[in-house]
């Protein structure tokens, strides 16, 4: 799927919402829907898809899967921990840290001026922190 633009608009919102939904599927399904060269990083139960849509690098975090203990554990680590700009939910911080090295290396290699982040549930929290 191609069609993202650099502006904030309904088309972009729809595409990124679809990516949030498709992030619950396997890599083959994600590649078929968005980009045959999309990659999946799956580290200690945190999953994130990265792909390109023209001049825009895109990152979609998978949300909580109720059958996955690692997701439930991340959601339940509710104690706040200090970060440079305030406080953050410990489970969300830990889950993002699990995949961030892979995501940041992938983003650096893309050399894109624009990056879009998305996710649902736990994935939405990770997308917010990543942005």
Residue ranges and their predicted role:
Residues 1-31:
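Charged, compositionally biased non-catalytic regions
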Residues 22-118, 129:
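A conserved cap/lid and substrate-binding interface adjacent to the catalytic center
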Residues 121-126:
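Active-site loop->helix "elbow" adjoining a glycine-rich segment at hydrolase catalytic centers
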């Amino acid at each position: 799927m191609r069609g993202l633009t650099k502006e904030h608009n309904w088309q972009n919102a729809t595409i990124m919402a679809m990516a949030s939904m498709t992030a619950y599927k396997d890599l083959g399904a994600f590649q078929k829907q968005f980009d045959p060269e999309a990659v999946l990083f799956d580290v200690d139960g945190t999953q994130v898809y990265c792909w390109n849509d023209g001049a825009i690098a895109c990152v979609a975090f998978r949300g909580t899967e109720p059958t996955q203990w690692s997701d439930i554990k991340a959601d339940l680590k509710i104690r706040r921990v200090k970060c440079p700009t305030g406080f953050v939910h410990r489970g969300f911080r830990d889950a993002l840290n699990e995949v961030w090295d892979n995501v940041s290396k992938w983003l650096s290699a893309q050399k894109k001026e624009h990056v879009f982040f998305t996710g649902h549930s736990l994935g939405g929290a990770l997308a917010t922190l990543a942005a």
